[in-house]
């Protein structure tokens, strides 16, 4: 699950830029 955390952060950051 810890490996999914950075992925989630990256996805949220990408959505924030839209």
UniProtKB/Swiss-Prot annotation:
Segment forming the signal sequence: none
Protein name (Swiss-Prot/TrEMBL): Medusin-TR1
Tissue-level expression: Expressed by the skin glands.
Protein source organism: Phyllomedusa trinitatis
Keyword terms of this UniProt record: Amidation, Amphibian defense peptide, Antibiotic, Antimicrobial, Cytolysis, Hemolysis, Immunity, Innate immunity, Secreted
GO biological process: defense response to bacterium; innate immune response; killing of cells of another organism
Compartments in which it is found: Secreted
Keyword Secreted carried by entry: yes
Function, as annotated: Antimicrobial peptide with activity against Gram-positive bacteria S.epidermidis ATCC 12228 (MIC=50 uM) and S.aureus (MIC=64 ug/ml and MBC=128 ug/ml). Not active against some Gram-positive bacteria (methicillin-resistant S.aureus (MRSA), E.faecalis), Gram-negative bacterium E.coli ATCC 25922 and fungus C.albicans at concentrations up to 100 uM. Can only slightly inhibit the formation of biofilm by S.aureus (minimal biofilm inhibitionconcentration MBIC=512 ug/ml, minimal biofilm eradication concentration MBEC>512 ug/ml).
Modified residues (Leucine amide): 18
Cellular component GO terms held in the UniProt record: extracellular region
Other remarks on this protein: The primary structure of this peptide is identical to that of Medusin-PT (AC A0A1M4BLT1).
Ligase listed as a keyword: no
Main location: secreted
Family: Belongs to the frog skin active peptide (FSAP) family. Medusin subfamily.
């Amino acid at each position: 699950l810890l490996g999914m955390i950075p992925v989630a952060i990256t996805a949220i950051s990408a959505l924030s830029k839209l």
